[in-house]
């Protein structure tokens, strides 16, 4: 084993950094046209104006759950890098099997 020792910081519970960028309103990066394109791919013709914020909130909850599980797999393997397989296993755990990314 490499010299990791006991304890150590897990992902997601790191100590304070000197210059930490404050992350807020990043969900607004999912733009209205991006949501519209996803809906078009799903076969939607017309979209209500209220859909965009609702879609952002649902997507945020979904990604938080997947990322939490993926980071749990990463920490269990004592790695600091989340791999594609961590995400595949996290999705599989939630009943959304994804093919084409190894494993």
Curated annotation (Swiss-Prot):
Which sequence ranges are marked TM in the entry?
A: none
Entry's localization field: Nucleus; Chromosome
Positions of the DNA-binding region: 17-21
> What GO terms are given for molecular function?
DNA binding; protein heterodimerization activity; structural constituent of chromatin
Regions of compositional bias (Gly residues) in chain numbering: 1-14
Top-rank lineage group of the source organism: Eukaryota
Going by the UniProt record, its keywords in alphabetical order are: Acetylation, Chromosome, DNA-binding, Methylation, Nucleosome core, Nucleus
Modification sites for N-acetylserine: 2
Disulfide cross-links: none
Q: Which GO terms describe its cellular component?
A: nucleosome; nucleus
For this protein, the record's Pfam families field holds: CENP-T_C (PF15511)
Q: Which residues carry this modification: N6-acetyllysine?
A: 17
Where is the PTM N6-methyllysine found along the chain? 21
Task: Write out the ranges of the annotated region (Disordered).
Answer: 1-20
Instruction: Report the InterPro entries cross-referenced here.
Output: CENP-T/H4_C, Histone-fold, Histone_H4, Histone_H4_CS
Protein's job: Core component of nucleosome. Nucleosomes wrap and compact DNA into chromatin, limiting DNA accessibility to the cellular machineries which require DNA as a template. Histones thereby play a central role in transcription regulation, DNA repair, DNA replication and chromosomal stability. DNA accessibility is regulated via a complex set of post-translational modifications of histones, also called histone code, and nucleosome remodeling.
**What family is this protein classified in?**
Belongs to the histone H4 family.
Sorted alphabetically, which PANTHER family does this protein's record hold? Answer: HISTONE H4
The subunit structure is: The nucleosome is a histone octamer containing two molecules each of H2A, H2B, H3 and H4 assembled in one H3-H4 heterotetramer and two H2A-H2B heterodimers. The octamer wraps approximately 147 bp of DNA.
Protein name as it appears in the record: Histone H4
Give the organism, scientific name.
Answer: Pyrenomonas salina
